[in-house]
């Protein structure tokens, strides 16, 4: 996503800015396919740890709860922001597995304080993520040039409670997940796709962009490509980024409604209306449900909140390094959460807050599961991401330590609405094996009241 001020740039400069900010590639297209790239999810299986408290709901594994599930939840709202790891936002959070000591190859340093507005983007493409991961040693960040310039150690920076007090307030009042992993070692495009489809067609990065078609998906020009992992040959190939894969709307039972709030479509630039990358939605009647973020306010006021919602910022409040300041982004999030909590819907709603990818920031916990083709260069899992679960029935003041991943969010939606797993339609989907997040809730507890917070004055 790009600042509106960049729209005044000359065309070549604007193109360079788009590609740099989004981590795009200059690949050329060899073939145009759906990009599924294979039919298996790899031979590895999830290793799910046990919560430190007794279960109060269904099995925590994605495969363990296949029968009808009775909960009071009628609405799920998934809020996706941009580019931060767990350590970056919650490394010093009490009771969570964080660290304030950052590991380099030959030394350990105190993790520096991260600035509200970062001076540059950090490399978070697939190859940079593999470098950072360094075969699970979690000490390769210094080999990426953007991580440290003039000794600022930016990639190891952290925000503490004084930097993001409202996010910390939510984490203290509700449930914070400290073992929630990205499904891909990589960037925004596949990360966003996993929230909708529990897969990304094996895409490893972002599509290239053109000035006339600055969208990530089916509306891009015919020459646009994205690199995907071909699981048949264990090589990369370039395909058109319009994937014929199932997504959550395909499995929701009749009468369960949905919307994606995140489009400023046909307003340059536009990359994170991610249903644009799913052929069956973009070129079907479901595209009418992809709307602007302002429509969420209208739907709450008009008593028309759908059962399943995704909320994604397309502007300067996305918290993406070098684009959106963190304070401004937190205020944006708080504004919408306040609306939901003050509405008639709070009593039966779950709000899930997380990130699309790691953004190039340091995290000290090695991803516990590798899948894809090559164990030395796995597709995922990626690095830990912040996860805050807010609901009257989220366990209060609870750190959810079970291993989970981006595909856990589609799995949670499926469990709440008694929908089949997407993996039953396409084995590439990762929801069938993913933790369903149910042990983050106590359906029998006294409901937690709304936590209405004040937006802050920003630097």
List the predicted regions and their residue ranges.
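N-terminal pro-sequences and low-complexity stem/linker regions of secreted or lumenal proteins
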Residues: 39, 64-459
